[in-house]
């Protein structure tokens, strides 16, 4: 079993429509959060109209609480306003309030909020990592990583995850804390995010050894959070990247789950904002077309390979996969110092985010177009990649 941060979001199956606004129904077995919802506004709604809508929601919510005298619902919690136009909010509402919201002409759709969590960790001690050598070589079995000395200098990687140990020696002061949307502890008390960050920008384990890393925490110490919190992290990363130069930014999301329109729309908003986004295809050995945000076509979707250049047995597959990257038995940083070995789609994805940062350092340009560049540079070597799936494995073009 591999390792991936897994979101369990909403399906589009049998969506109901009330006065034009879809209330997306949940698939059997989905772990939803009681009375919690994500509301997405119509495309093109103005800031003024969005403010007016939220004021209406807050007024009506307060009136309902006073009128019914029942246990309090929390009301509106998060507000989303991506610079590329996606607007919405999440909150704690009763069914009657949600039905009222769905009747508004300015609402596009509503999803139930859902749990985000990490699957079991596969760990093996004292095993050398092979992923870096494979990225820098056209042949398997190498032990040396060949790369240009620019090494991603000037690029910034946003790691949307469990946080990052920014004091770890691997980052040499290049890692900073960005934002936290899940708890009040600005630290990685799980280890997943630090491992991912090390693969992107660590001095020893990183594909882009001189890149900057920004921690965006959306999952807690148990590797758990919510879709609404993850979307908040995506919005924050997009805005911060645009302030600092989106063409120099990449983002990594080693998380995913069943199809969610809100998750896909948020991922598309990152790409539209000019940020290269690498996302895990999924860790369930199924077609990734039903996974989110992996199924969003404007981002770069990653599957996991083994040291033998075959599909990892846990990796998702399918037409939505853009490239393969090393994901089995990968060594990287762990919180508090030192390293650990983990396997999963979570480990493959940062190889691609790191390669994106590396190419930015080489002056290859940034943004979602980097995915096409990476696919063009990839080598056709993956054995048994899965039905309707690319056999391309990433390569940094070093010529070795």
UniProtKB/Swiss-Prot annotation:
Residues 36-118 form the Inhibitor I9 domain. It holds the Pfam family Peptidase_S8. The active site is at 161 (charge relay system), 192 (charge relay system), 346 (charge relay system). It is found in: Secreted. Residues 1-20 form the signal peptide. GO terms for cellular component: extracellular region. It is an enzyme of class 3 (hydrolase). It comes from the Eukaryota. Residues 129-400 form the Peptidase S8 domain. Glycans are attached at residues 222, 252, 396. GO terms for biological process: proteolysis. CDD domains: Peptidases_S8_PCSK9_ProteinaseK_like (cd04077). Residues 21-119 form a propeptide. Its EC number is 3.4.21.-. Belongs to the peptidase S8 family. Secreted subtilisin-like serine protease with keratinolytic activity that contributes to pathogenicity. This is Subtilisin-like protease 7. It comes from Trichophyton soudanense. The lineage of its organism: Eukaryota, Fungi, Dikarya, Ascomycota, Pezizomycotina. The gene is SUB7.
